Every structure is written in C-alpha cells, then in structure tokens.
C-alpha cells in the first residue's frame, strides 16, 4: 500500500489561504465550544479553569476550578456540557456536568457507572434528539482507574446512562461526533502506545442510539492520531491530528499537526496546518457557522472555511 504523504495535502479549497490566526493565549487549551452570541468557552486544563473569549477579544475566567474539564459542547437548549477529567494535576471531577448559562445552574449528570468512578471523561457530543455521547479513556495516571474498561457512554434524555462501546471493539476512545439526524456516530480511537490504534471509526445508530456496523474511515498510523473532531454540514470530518515534534516512541513525523478534512468515505480532502504542538480540538462558530476555533498548545487559533459546522446549537442563519 502506498504511504500517504500527509504533509503534501493542500489547504481545503474553502479555507483561508492566510492560515490560522491566534485568538488568545493561555497554558494548555482544549474543549472549545461556541454559543449563539459568539462567545468561545475553552478549557485551560493545566490551570484548572474554563476561559470565556468574547467576540470583542475580551478574555475572562468562566469557571475556576474547572475540575480539569477537557471536552465541552452545547445542547439544543444552549446548555454547556463539560467532561471533567483527571489529567494534568489533582482535583479532577471524573464526571459529566452541565451549566445553564442563563440561570447559572450547574449540575452533575453522571459521575459513576456500575458504582465506580469514570476514568477521565474526554470529549462529548449531542445528537439531534438531545442525547449526549461521551468518551472515557485514561491517558494519565492509570493507577487511579476503578474500572478496566475505557468506553463510550450515552446519556439519554431521561438521565439514564448506558455504556455503548468498549474493548475489544475499540482501543482508547477520544473525539466523538454524531450526525444531527442521529444516524451515524464517528469515533476517534487514539492510543499513545506504539502499537495502539490511530483509527477513525463510524457506526450506524438505531432509533435508541445503539451503535452497530463498525467501519474504518481512516487510519493515521504510524503517526500521532486524532484528538478532537467535528462535522460540517456536508458530512465531512474535521480532525485535530498529528504532531510537529514527536514526544515519545509512539509518535512519528508522518502526520504533521493540523486540521484534517476527511470525507465520510474516508478520502483526505485537505489539511489546515497548525505550527504549534499539541493540537487537541476544534469547534465551529461565528454568525454563519464558518469560523473554526482550534486549540493547540497554549493558543486558541481561528480561521474561516466555506461550509458551516453541523452542531446541535446554535442554528446558523
């Protein structure tokens, strides 16, 4: 099989030729989510806080401590969901929480499964019916694990939590996205181990949100695989993947850091290069849904694309 030359992938035809621009700097960025007013909420995991960046560039602390929040997303009602993890220091929540931005109400949706704590909830998405799907790997201290499984879970609208994917079907789940017709689930399966998975899977979903018919969309091996992921309105995947300077034996220079655009059929459509390590996640925003915000290292970057993002909230004009 011919080796893929990731570094030679062109900018997607709809991306700004100027590339990405820095929007703001913190310590270690993750989990961007954008509300209807254009405010960007993103995690600063090392400093244990969530930052709010207003459209005028004003930066403020939204929550501190954040209980090591990682991925975030909005539901159809404009409520902000948080994956409270366990990485980069003590005080991690190891749970899924939700904030009502209008009232300020903050609630715990789930913090245990079968009586034991989650590993480190990593990323989350909402389907068209309001159900939440989240991943629970362990990339940090594995001695804290109370369960042997690194799985994917669904929170139904009545609050019931079900584990829907686990080993051996998957290795280490990370980024996750569900189409707004609630029919397909995309999953990043990304292990830091040299022989671990660096795959993107797709599953069919039935009416109850149960996955089946697992297929491979793309495999980034032997390079660093993807982290966060989003979908656009055309159904294409936007994957925060790769590394510019490998950190350990499980990473190579085969996949340079950037946002990789992949069709639902697995075709590589382009790459938006990002020069800073470590690229982690992205979110769609802006009045028309065509601005993307990218978290990488200490920086929140922004650029423009032609196709709006596919999100539960807000709905683009």
Range-by-range predicted roles:
Residues 1-317:
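Sequence-structural signature of mature extracellular/luminal beta-sheet repeat domains
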């Amino acid at each position: 099989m011919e080796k893929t030359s990731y570094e030679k992938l062109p900018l997607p035809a709809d991306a700004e030729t100027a590339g990405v621009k820095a929007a703001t700097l913190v310590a270690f960025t993750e989990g961007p989510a954008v509300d209807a007013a254009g405010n960007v909420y993103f995690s600063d995991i090392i400093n244990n806080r969530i930052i709010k960046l207003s459209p005028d560039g004003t930066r403020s602390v939204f929550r501190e401590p954040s209980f090591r929040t990682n991925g975030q997303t909005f539901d159809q009602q404009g409520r902000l969901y948080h994956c409270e993890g366990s990485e980069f220091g003590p005080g991690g929540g190891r749970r899924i929480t939700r904030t009502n931005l209008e009232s300020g109400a903050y609630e715990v949706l789930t913090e245990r499964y079968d009586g034991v704590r989650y590993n480190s909830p990593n990323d989350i998405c909402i389907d068209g019916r309001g159900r939440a799907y989240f991943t629970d790997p362990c990339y940090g201290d594995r001695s804290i694990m109370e369960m042997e499984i690194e799985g994917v879970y669904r929170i139904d609208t009545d609050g019931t939590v079900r584990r829907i994917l686990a080993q051996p079907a998957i290795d280490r789940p990370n980024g996750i996205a569900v189409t707004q017709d609630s029919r397909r689930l995309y999953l990043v399966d990304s292990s830091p181990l040299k022989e671990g998975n660096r795959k993107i899977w797709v599953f069919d979903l039935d009416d109850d949100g149960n996955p089946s018919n697992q297929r491979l969309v793309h495999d980034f091996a032997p390079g660093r695989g993807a982290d966060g992921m989003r979908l656009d309105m055309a159904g294409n995947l936007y994957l925060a993947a790769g590394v510019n300077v490998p950190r350990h034996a499980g990473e190579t220079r085969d996949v340079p850091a950037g946002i990789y655009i992949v069709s639902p059929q697995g075709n590589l459509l382009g790459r938006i290069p990002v020069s800073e390590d470590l690229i982690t996640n992205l979110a769609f925003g802006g009045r028309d849904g065509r601005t993307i915000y990218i978290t990488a290292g200490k920086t929140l970057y922004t650029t423009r694309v032609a196709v709006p993002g596919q999100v539960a909230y807000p709905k683009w004009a």
